[in-house]
Each structure stands twice: as C-alpha cells, then as structure tokens.
Amino acid sequence: MISIIDDDRSVREAVKSLIRSLGYEAVTFASAEEYLGADGAHESECVITDVQMPGMTGMDLQDRLIADGYRRPIIFMSAMSAEDTGATAASRFLRKPFSDERLIDCLDRALKSPPPNSCRS
C-alpha cells in the first residue's frame, strides 16, 4: 500500500490514479494528522507527502514516523525547491509540477533501495 498525503485534492487524486495504474494499492489523506490517525498507516510500503500543509508539515510527519520506528521510504512533493523546504540531500524529493515518468522513477527507486536515496527533480 502506498499512502499519499496532500492538502490539495486534485494532487492526491492524480497521484493515486497513477499509482493504481502501476498495480499498487493507494490510499489518500488530506493531512498528516489524518494519516497518523488511520488504522494501518505504519504498514505503508511508501509514503508520498506534500511538504507544506496546514498543521503538521511533511517534514514534521517524517520526524514523527522515524520516532515511531517507521523505516520505509518517504517521498516529498513541493512546489518549492528541496533547499527551500529543508529537505536533506538524502531525501526523495519531487518538485511540483512533475511528470508521471518522474514519479514512477522516484517510486521505483524508493521501493527497490533502502532509505536514504535521492531522486531529485
């Protein structure tokens, strides 16, 4: 299962549609808090999250997941550059807007290699 977290519904739905077309189960959440409150959230094979969201940011979510023992890939999405968001060089990062091919490549590399691994665009 791939979890997609973004406060923009159109982004959530577009990413979910692409992920499902690749044969993965995908679930969406409008906020980091909604994701954390969901049953089985920590069972995600990968989390794809927006960086800038109301309430808990994507970076805050990463910190929380790591503290809770989550050791699977996290891919960040943002209209800002990785440097402007505070994403580290080791973070998986997609700058919006990104192509389907870019997301597919980043997801493929994230799922095939242990964190961290960069796939910047």
Model-derived regions, located:
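Two-component/phosphorelay signaling modules centered on CheY-like receiver
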Residues: R9-V27
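Conserved phosphotransfer cores of two-component systems
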Residues: D39-H42, R64-R71, E83, T88
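Active-site residues of response regulator receiver
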Residues: D50, S78
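Alpha4 helix (beta4-alpha4-beta5 surface) of REC/receiver domains from two-component response regulators
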Residues: D60, M80-R95, E101, D105
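Acidic, metal-coordinating helix/loop segments flanking the phosphotransfer/catalytic sites
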Residues: T28-C46
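Acidic catalytic/metal-coordinating carboxylates
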Residues: A30-S31, T57-D60
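C-terminal output helix
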Residues: F98-L111, P115-R120
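Receiver (REC) domain active-site loop signature in two-component systems and cognate sites
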Residues: M53
